[in-house]
Amino acid sequence: MTITKKISDKNWTVEELKNLSYEELMELYKSLPSVEFDKIDGEYDATMLKYPTERGRILGEWTLYGTGSSHWLGKAFTPSSENPEFRGEGYNKFRVDGKEVHHTRFASDMHESMIDGKLVFRMRYSPFKNFSGSVDMIDEVRFLQEDLCLCIGTYNPEKLPPDFFCLFGPLNVYDHSSEWPYGNEIRRMSKVPFTLDNYPFPEELKNE
């Protein structure tokens, strides 16, 4: 592969990242440094890139875009937190009934990467009471260029292999006055509405 040779002599676009294979994304990811903790600040749009399996892709796209309640737009970060146990925190952006809403919060810190042990920017969802926290979702963020980050998403006990996505921005400042329409995810589980009507594997529901 020659992906790492391309980094210094070009500006990447989201479309170019989408055209890379899973193996090429992994090679590229391993070659990158972490984003600096204090510099990832504000709201970013996001695009899913690749999943390790076809089943993972189908389930992932249904979870993010097909539950009938929301459409995932991206993430937002602040390098500080009112909670002394967190170094930083953030939220996910969704479009619901034509409006942008914020939920699925996370805590952020620097930690050893699950991929190669390098120090990396990490998002942990388990400190908050939301679905992503219930499956112990952990994301990592690495710096590709000034407006673009390459990221992995993991969940469940096995964690690996990860999903790949990218973040581009920041496009807006962090919204410190978010209203948390489904609950603040601190004392009680967030009540995000969803439907299983479009679940991609309906035969599995019959066996429950």
Regions inferred by a protein language model and the residue ranges of each:
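Soluble ligand-binding/transfer domains with enclosed cavities or grooves
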Residues: 2-208
